[in-house]
Amino acid sequence: MSKQQRRKGNAKNASSASAHGYLAQGGENFVGLTPEMNIFEMASSNRLSNFSGIDDETRIVMRKLTKKDCQTREKGLRELTNIIAETSSIENCYEHFCGLVPQLSTDGSPTVRLLTMKTITLFLVKLEKSACKGLKKIIPMVLFARCDVTNGVAAAAGAVIRDGFEADKKQKVIQLFAPLVFEMAAKIVQGKHDLSVPVEYDASEDREARKSRLETQSLNVFLSYIKEFGADSTIWEEEARKLFENIAFLKMVFGGTNAALKVQVLNLAYRFKNNVEVILNTPSIVTYIQNHLDSQTFTPECSTAWEGMIILLPSAQFHTKVSLQNGIYPRFLNVIRKKGNHWRVLQHFLLPAVVLLLKEMGSLENNMKVLGTIMESFTDNLPWPTDASINAVLSWFNAFSDFVRWILTNDRINLVVWEKLHPLIVTVTEQAMTFPTKEIAECVTDLLQWIIELKTINEADVSTLLLNIESKIVGAGTENSRLIKHLLTEPGKNIVLSNLHANLLSSPELVDFQIIKNLSCSENDYFNATSQKISNFSFIEKTENFDITQAGDIVRLIKLLLENQEIKSLNISVKNDHVGRRLLLTGGSTIWNKLLKNVPVSTFQNMINYWHEKRNGTAIADAVSFLKEMGVEMDTKQAAENVEFLITLLRKMKSTDVSNEAEKNVLILKLFTAIFESDEDAKSEHYNCLSEHLTSDFNSGQFFEKLFASSEEYDIERILETACRVDKLIDLCEEQTRQNIVNNVLLSGKQCGTIIEQFQFLELEVMSCSTKPTVISTTHQHCYSHLDEHKAKEIVTESARIALFNISSKCECFFLISHEQFFFSDYNSAHQVFGWQVISIISALEKRYSLVALTEELQRSRREIEERLIRSDEVRFKLDDSSPCIFLADAYDMSFEQKKKYIQCQAEPSKVPEHALEVLYRENQTPLDFLMNVFEGGYQMFDFDRSKNYHWMINLMFVKKCIQYGGSIFVAEESGLRDYALCGIVTVLDIHKRSTLQQSTDILGNTPNAFDEDPRLEALTTLFIELYLVLNDSIKNDNHPTQTIEEWKEFYVPTINSLFIRMFRMIRKEQQPTPFVRTLLKAMFTLVEFPTNVPNDSVVTREFVPELSVFKYSLLEESFIAQAFILLSSNVEHVQLIGYAAAKLLVPIMFKTENPQVLDDDQDETEIMVANRSKLNLPVMISKSYPVDHIHKHVGPLLLSLAILPLETTKEFVLNQEQRVAYCDAIDSFFKNALNALMLDQPFDFSQVPIVCKIRKQMYFFQFRYSSHFFTAKSQEREYYLQSDLTASPLFFEKFASRLLFKSITLLPAAVRLFHKNIPNNFKPIFQEVVTKHASKLLIENELNKVQNAEFGEVLKVRTVPVTGQIISEYTVEDTKMKLTIELPRDYPLSVPAMNLDKAIVKGDRAKKWLLQLNAYLFHQNGAILEGIEMWKRNVDKGIEGAEDCTICMMTVHQQTNQLPKVKCKQCKNRFHSNCLVSSFHTYKWFESSNQSTCPLCRNNFT
């Protein structure tokens, strides 16, 4: 193949099919080879030389069956099965396949043999009668394969006969072809058949393996046929007898090492009718049998040998060849004396063989002697080897037991042999105690029990035997004799063993619990016989030795012993142990009088305390009741909450006297409490018992309200489970008392109202924040008592638990099936109303404390309550009350009539004309319709009489409708409406006492408690601030006319912003986050700068700050600064943020006031001189306010945000480079502490892990949750790090911390780098990971964008490479470019950028100075990349400023060296390039061309 042909894409895979195609194309031109030839087919060439009548595809498949590789043969068989299934004419294929069956069915691959059988089955099934002509070839091989050593092949061969022939012909087929199979099998075994030699192409196994496999399979042919058809069938004998006539074959078998083959030959010999003759005619078989009677292998050689011995022993022919007395009998003795694995076989064959031996040996006397010797041989060579098989040992014991039983049941020999058996039994028993297996011990003890029950041996001999065994037990020790002792003393044993049992109990070194238990469980006769013989009762007197599982049996035995009048020496001391406690529970007069009567009461009390710890109330009740009957009173206070204890006491109360009713009621209430306070659900019998004792006057004492009044987080599932428990209990109560019990257990309507009353302070949230304009309560004119966050959440959580519990109970509703509707009782409707109110209260609470997420319990409580609420007529009726609850009106959708009635109720309809009131509830009016009706109706608006509810109502609804209408006010057709609404904002927010109307309040004067005096004023103010914010957002985001925007910004914004600043002064440090506080916070965040139009009247500094007095602050400024930083230390986060927002506006004033001289100086920005650097100061209130403790966790980060404000380039702050460096130095120490607080002191889940972990967790959460949605991890990074989100939400401080961290690494990269270097090592990798993964890439992107968007002039061209983070600056002078490369690392700013300067056009030391200066600015002085490039450009500009052209080359920068003219003439002061004067590589060679070393201009000599 040429090189072109070998190119990629031209190569093809080698395959048999490809080779066949090439050979077919070439015919016989390739040295006589054709597609039909194969070098591996030589062994089958005669059979396969001509495939006539089959197509090419089938021919190829048939050829595969003769391939050398077994995988190819397997593939060919599978393809052949497909052809058989898909092709209709397969006779020719079948004919050719039959010739291959002998080789394939004996193939070395089991898979090939298996597939061959399956293929034969397919042929037979499909061809049916047409397959008859090939049966003679294939059926013998199938029958042969039925005995294959591989089970799968044998099963497949059996399936051929089963599926290929009808049921009545199967046996005939086998009988017909069996002689052929036997003939083939015999030849294969003798090595005379062609199949016994592997064909040349079969490489699956070697010659020996194939020979062994086929020999085994051939002998199995005979044995399996005999097993299937019985030994009576003799058609197999002719061929089998040839095997035993072949002396060479037998010598080969028994002289070889194939044990399985020997066993098969022996088994075949045993199946002949004249088997003894066949065996004796083969001397090697007789020798083999005698030699393998004690074979230790795990093959069946030993059992086969004994089977042959059993056949030979009765034969007289065998006796003539082998002496029983001198040959077989000694051999038997040797086999018995030997202790090995052969005993597993001897157990089954020894006794029959010995019986036959004794029968053939003759006289009784001789037999007794032989039998005695055989029995003595059992105990020879003891003990057994330690490595002996336990199965073999057990077989030895079983064999000995069988011999003993046979001997003792034989009247002729039992008494004669007993004298020898007695010591042997003792020895065997002693040997059994050396093996810790129950089977061996059972074998021996069963034999002893059988001997005792047989009664053949007299009692004296039996007693002697037992005494000898007892002595062996004593000698063996406690552990070795354990099993024997337990089994000999088991219940149900013969009374003869009672003496042994008593002796064991009386011996402390031999007794154990099982022996004691056996006595306690024995029958009366055995127990009495044994107990009377016990001489020492110490085994039971030490009761502390028994555990709780043994105590029951011990107490039963003690009770039996106490009832036995003949036992006097029992001395038991009752203690607080398991036995003592069980004795107390057992009770009874006998135990009390003999054991418990004199026990100290303290012992009984300790028992009760123990049961209390184990929560065993039943035991406590039983014990207390028994002791009470005996006149002993016990303290049971600890068990008062135990359900079992209480139930048991109730059941034991037999008397129903009035004197016991009080005690009974107390127990019932305790049981009620215990069931519902338990972590686990009570049992059914507990509920049944409680329901039996509950009456209609049962009083739970507000149990569930107290149960749920817990400050800890409560599992919602527990509440629902408690409701289910109540349902279970109520269902079991009687119908006449059920409803009364429900009323006493669940919350009443009056109680619900009492709970709601404590949430009046949250009504302000509904009035101010509800999206339903009609939900306005103006009836509450008293001062609200605002709770702090902790207390408010606590009582709301408790109320939510109670509401969920009450509405979760199914017993609150009754069904009217005929109408398919719910009907509620008064209690149920009260619970539903209470549920509606609670979800409104939870929402109001969520709005109030918006910076902190609701607890998981409250969130889930709200969901669970909402799922169970039902909108029903009964609940709607509650809205028709004269004073409906504002929470219910907020949560429930009111109808038009209800809205009308609600408004009429609030607006004092008796004093308001109906036509004037109609505007408030008119149906189907849009917000614009309402505003126009009010605008044209002449109502008192904005500055109104505060004593009239109606005026409050119209103003509150007006502002809510304005908020709904939003920015559309600016484009309203009626321009008067726009001015009316906008002026109303200013009017309401700037209400003074100068108003002539009655009861007007000045909220901006010196009355900071104005809102507390009238909450309606706070709601109104809040709504108008909200309206301003809505309109302000509309101006920013919507398209409005230019005139409208200018009017808004020039008139309304300055005026209202000034009002906001004045409102800020009335915020108190301890003030709760009411709607006004939260809305003012939003308004403060919208302010860009401190208003200049704030009036300076009546300003009183709330706190004197000495640090501020040294600066030239105005009284107004000092007052606001002090107020802002006072609020920063508040415990209320919203108030903290208001202080922060105000301080943020005041920082520019503070910075300029406290650094006046430095900021006024006009510094040179070319170089930053450390020695002469001006000093700037951090505003003193920022450093002074830094907390010394961790109480105010957010103050540190908030102050850090204020401290770095001067570094941000804004209208208020424009610092040059030197001033930036000076300010960075000033805040260095503060920055370290504040950044540490930012990282470590945030109130998140990780108390001792940096906040960055929270940031990282948040990023991973979003990345996982929104990976396939709109929100991606990247967008979340930008949201957290780049966007300044000041929305008051639970994520506020997380986002604030993330943004502040990003600003810190942007403005103070060097300081952050130093901080990272010094933080503890366990935090360092986490900080590194977060900054690298999230912040660095955004920071690098920002830096590159800044540089990319900057303008540097014509001489400096800057480009960025975002992929590598490179910034390449090229400074061009004439045709020469000097290049500065800055590469930002991936973890910038934690690692420093790499810088490189190429083609410097100034001296090397000056270029290095520029780089060092840039390095110092970026690495140590918190310089930005853009500013560093600008500084480097200024240095280069200054370096080449005033540089003149070289008059030789007329260029400023040398084209080759990129240097400025440096060589100076002392006379004319002109400068030249050194290369222009002397270089030999340049066109200009002045010294050489002029042949002198003079100046080209003044001719002065340079030398």
UniProtKB/Swiss-Prot annotation:
SMART domains: RING. It comes from the Eukaryota. HEAT repeats lie at residues 52-89, 93-129, 133-170, 280-318, 323-345, 346-384, 552-589, 640-663, 664-700, 845-882, 1022-1065, 1078-1117, 1141-1183, 1302-1340. Keywords: Cytoplasm, Metal-binding, Repeat, Transferase, Ubl conjugation pathway, Zinc, Zinc-finger. It is found in: Cytoplasm, Cytosol. Its EC number is 2.3.2.27. Gene3D superfamilies: Leucine-rich Repeat Variant, Zinc/RING finger domain, C3HC4 (zinc finger). It is an enzyme of class 2 (transferase). GO terms for molecular function: ribosomal large subunit binding; ubiquitin protein ligase activity; zinc ion binding. Pathway: Protein modification; protein ubiquitination. A zinc finger (RING-type) spans 1446-1499. One of its GO terms (cellular component) is cytosol. GO terms for biological process: protein ubiquitination; rescue of stalled ribosome; ribosome-associated ubiquitin-dependent protein catabolic process. It holds the Pfam family UBC_like. It catalyses: S-ubiquitinyl-[E2 ubiquitin-conjugating enzyme]-L-cysteine + [acceptor protein]-L-lysine = [E2 ubiquitin-conjugating enzyme]-L-cysteine + N(6)-ubiquitinyl-[acceptor protein]-L-lysine. The keyword Zinc-finger applies. E3 ubiquitin-protein ligase. Component of the ribosome quality control complex (RQC), a ribosome-associated complex that mediates ubiquitination and extraction of incompletely synthesized nascent chains for proteasomal degradation. Ubiquitination leads to vcp/p97 recruitment for extraction and degradation of the incomplete translation product. Belongs to the LTN1 family. Component of the ribosome quality control complex (RQC), composed of at least the E3 ubiquitin ligase ltn1 and nemf. The complex probably also contains tcf25 as well as vcp/p97 and its ubiquitin-binding cofactors. RQC forms a stable complex with 60S ribosomal subunits. This is E3 ubiquitin-protein ligase listerin. It comes from Caenorhabditis briggsae.
